[in-house]
UniProtKB/Swiss-Prot annotation:
Substitution effect: R170A: Decreases heterodimer formation with ARNT. Impairs heterodimer formation with ARNT
Lineage, broadest ranks: Eukaryota, Metazoa, Chordata, Craniata, Vertebrata
PTM entry text: S-nitrosylation of Cys-810 may be responsible for increased recruitment of p300 coactivator necessary for transcriptional activity of HIF-1 complex.
Matching SUPFAM superfamilies: HLH, helix-loop-helix DNA-binding domain (SSF47459), PYP-like sensor domain (PAS domain) (SSF55785)
Protein name: Hypoxia-inducible factor 1-alpha
Length: 836
């Protein structure tokens, strides 16, 4: 038993010795192995602090990569570098905007420059020897394999095998926006623009002849340039760089103003236009593919391409485009481009697109210069000569053809000698704002302010007894076939004929009038549109005044026909003087008026005859005066001598003889200083009062007027006045504006007897000067609304006309004690109270 136990102990000891020896041997191998790796690590061209911390796998990986690089360098047949080249090598990486990477045909990174840490956050020894597919985006692997493939097939004659490579690669990046390094598991994707070529090395030349031929070594040499984000551009942009923003369809939504100096475009004219309109045609395919990569990978660099300048030629541009994503839904929002212009304008005299022809063919001078040259050019060019000139410049023909939507206006500057003046001035706009036509018909009146020649005579009217005279033509006069002298506030010297046969009236030229006005010390500004009108035959250049033109355009020319039936919200009190209800009277027809008898001289404050005249140049205003008649010889003598500057506006509505004497009625309670408001209707009212005395068969309006005028002002109730005003306003809105109506009377000029004048408070009035056959009798007509004018001016052959009562008169007047007396005001109220 003891012998068996001793044998077992011996076996145990021998096994322990063997194990110990094995452990020692393994320890020795590991130590030797470590020494070898240590020595090998120090043989690598790496810094000591890096090589001393490498594990065995990294040492082996880096050693293999080093050997491959040495093999490539030896196969390249590079000469030994001198000291100068060795010193320059350290500046290459600083000059590059990226890092260098060498890949084998399997995708192993044989070499990568040490500045990769600056752009990607990963160190050189962490990437060297690894497969590139371990650090790139999975969607880019297929494209990467295609780039690594070198096709050795037959090449067509005359063509070389394309070994150039340019593509975009998304690679892992451990750098944060603040420059810190994160874990590889949290890395983001960064777009690299990889450019380079495939290089094939033949390694058999340096190998000994042993009967074994190795395949050539293929590698891809790349320069990888990361594309900076527009928000993280560290280098400030110079004057040769401009920014632009585009929509997803590549249309400009913003452009930097520096493009004007570089390419000639204004930022405003690029907005809304596609960037493809400005690409050179030969670069469009390349840029289209680049834009596809941009939407796929987020960022691209276009490389150098040609972009068309505005006035011809092109410039070389390189663009870095970045897709900006929405932070909420991660959808693409817009595209921001940083454009680097790397050259000046090349072939600036060469046109590449239609957009460049717009700026080339556009004239430099302004539109005002063009219109001036168009109207001042007298000699006409031959059409054949013009056609020959245009054939030499075919590009200019595109500017001559009208575009869609253009308005074609035919300009005919040639005038036929046989063309009448009526046809030439057929469409001249007439500013009919002085004497207004009837509201019942649209009148075609040639006013004095229209630029009609003085030789044109008005058409003869129908019979003066026609009641439609006021509705058809209110300003045309039935006169002999003589030219009419037309006048307004502009002072003119008029020559009256010595005999009825010599009845032509001559106007002084506008040049003379303006000269006289300038020389007058108290020269006043024009007061009517007629002062801006010139004779067509006169020289417009000599009489053209800028001040007159400015005032002409300041005139109110809107209301061509103020009596048109249109609703207005204007208050009547803002348009006409206040006329109380108790001053109303029944309108009479014109045929019931009789010659007036003069009983007393007219007081200065009340004028019975409404006349219109022009005073001296110092006071060019229209006033109403009361005058008496003068003999024919005295009127002719004063007219011939041209001693009077007063211009009397007269008209001849009928052939009825006008009485030679005038008179006035007794002033009413509202006249003079007792009047609330000076009313222009007083004159006409007083004329009709005197007419009642001469016509026994007519209505006795004088008694009615006296009854109303005796009502004291303080007896009127304010409520009654307000109700009366409202009723009057409705009546005036229906019948027309009564403040235009003026009294009917005669105005004859008498030398030496000038009554005091009173300014009219209503609108401007226009009249004609007409000469009767005897040349002495003259009349004045003031136009009023057509409905009232028919009653005032309408001639009736029946002398026994019945009174015409309106619905308004029927409402407020109660006929008692005969039809001659109508109650008004308080008397009407008392009568109604008695009836009730």
């Amino acid at each position: 038993m003891e012998g068996a136990g001793g044998e077992n102990e011996k076996k145990k000891m021998s096994s322990e010795r063997r194990k110990e020896k094995s452990r020692d041997a393994a320890r020795s191998r590991r130590s030797k192995e470590s020494e070898v790796f240590y020595e090998l690590a120090h043989q690598l061209p790496l810094p000591h602090n890096v090589s001393s911390h490498l594990d065995k796998a990294s040492v082996m990986r880096l050693t293999i990569s080093y050997l491959r690089v040495r093999k490539l360098l030896d196969a390249g047949g590079l000469d030994s570098e001198d000291e100068m080249k060795a010193q320059m090598d350290c500046f290459y990486l600083k000059a590059l905007d990226g890092f260098v990477m060498v890949l084998t045909d399997d995708g192993d990174m044989v070499y990568i420059s040490d500045n990769v840490n600056k752009y990607m956050g990963l160190t050189q020894f962490e990437l060297t020897g690894h497969s590139v597919f371990d650090f790139t985006h999975p969607c880019d692997h297929e494209e990467m394999r295609e780039m690594l493939t070198h096709r050795n097939g037959p090449v067509r004659k005359g063509k070389e095998l394309n070994t150039q490579r340019s593509f975009f690669l998304r690679m892992k990046c451990t750098l944060t926006s603040r420059g810190r390094t994160m874990n590889i598991k949290s890395a983001t994707w960064k777009v690299l623009h990889c450019t380079g070529h495939i290089h094939v090395y033949d390694t058999n030349s340096n190998q000994p002849q042993c009967g074994y031929k190795k395949p050539p070594m293929t590698c891809l040499v790349l320069i990888c340039e990361p594309i900076p984000h527009p928000s993280n551009i560290e280098i400030p942009l110079d004057s040769k760089t401009f920014l632009s923003r585009h929509s997803l369809d590549m249309k400009f939504s913003y452009c930097d103003e520096r493009i004007t100096e570089l390419m000639g475009y204004e930022p405003e004219e690029l907005l809304g236009r596609s960037i493809y309109e400005y690409y050179h045609a030969l670069d469009s395919d390349h840029l289209t593919k680049t834009h596809h990569d941009m939407f796929t990978k987020g960022q691209v660099t276009t490389g150098q391409y040609r972009m068309l300048a505005k006035r011809g030629g092109y410039v070389w541009v390189e663009t870095q485009a970045t897709v900006i994503y929405n932070t909420k839904n991660s959808q693409p929002q817009c595209i921001v481009c940083v454009n680097y212009v790397v050259s000046g304008i090349i072939q600036h005299d060469l046109i590449f697109s239609l957009q460049q022809t717009e700026s080339v063919l556009k004239p430099v001078e302004s539109s005002d210069m063009k219109m001036t040259q168009l109207f001042t050019k007298v000699e006409s060019e031959d059409t054949s000569c013009l056609f020959d000139k245009l054939k030499k410049e075919p590009d200019a023909l595109t500017l001559l053809a009208p575009a869609a939507g253009d308005t074609i206006i035919s300009l005919d500057f040639g005038s036929d000698d046989t063309e009448t003046e009526d046809q030439q001035l057929e469409d001249v706009p007439l500013y009919n704002d002085v004497m207004f036509p009837s509201s019942n018909e649209k009148l075609n009146i040639n006013l004095a302010m229209s630029p009609l020649p003085s030789s044109e005579t008005p058409k003869p009217l129908r019979s003066s007894a026609d009641p439609a005279l006021n509705q058809e033509v209110a300003l045309k006069l039935e006169s002999s076939p003589e030219s009419l002298g037309l006048s307004f506030t502009m002072p003119q010297i008029q020559d009256q004929p010595a005999s009825p046969s010599d009845g032509s009236t001559r106007q002084s030229s506008p040049e003379r009038l303006l000269q006289e006005n300038v020389n007058t010390p108290n020269f006043s500004q024009p007061n009517s549109p007629s002062e801006y009108c010139f004779d067509v035959d006169s020289d417009m250049v000599n009489v053209f005044k800028l001040e007159l033109v400015e005032k002409l355009f300041a005139e109110d020319t809107e209301a061509k026909n103020p009596f048109s039936t249109q609703d207005t919200d204007l208050d009547l009190e803002m348009l006409a003087p206040y006329i109380p209800m108790d001053d109303d009277f029944q309108l009479r027809s014109f045929d019931q008026l009789s010659p007036l008898e003069s009983n007393s001289p007219s007081p200065p404050s009340m004028s019975t005859v409404t006349g219109f005249q022009q005073t001296q140049l110092q006071k060019p205003t229209i006033t109403a005066t009361a005058t008496t008649t003068a003999t024919t010889d005295e009127s002719k003598t004063e007219t011939k001598d041209n001693k009077e500057d007063i211009k009397i506006l007269i008209a001849s509505p009928s052939s009825t003889q006008v009485p030679q004497e005038t008179t006035t009625a007794k002033a009413s309670a509202y006249s003079g200083t007792h009047s609330r408001t000076a009313s222009p209707d007083r004159a006409g009212k007083r004329v009709i009062e005197q007419t009642d005395k001469a016509h026994p068969r007519s209505l006795n309006l004088s008694a009615t007027l006296n009854q109303r005028n005796t009502v004291p002002e303080e007896e009127l109730n304010p409520k009654t006045i307000a109700s009366q005003n409202a009723q009057r306003k409705r009546k005036m809105e229906h019948d027309g504006s009564l403040f235009q109506a003026a009294g009917i009377g005669t105005l004859l000029q008498q030398p030496g007897d000038c009554a005091p004048t009173m300014s009219l408070s209503w609108k401007r009035v226009k009249g004609f000067i007409s000469s009767e056959q005897n040349g002495t009798e003259q009349k004045t007509i003031i136009l009023i609304p057509s409905d009232l004018a028919c009653r005032l001016l309408g001639q009736s052959m029946d002398e026994s006309g019945l009174p015409q009562l309106t619905s308004y008169d029927c409402e407020v007047n109660a006929p008692i004690q005969g039809s001659r007396n109508l109650l008004q005001g308080e008397e009407l109220l008392r009568a109604l109270d008695q009836v009730n």
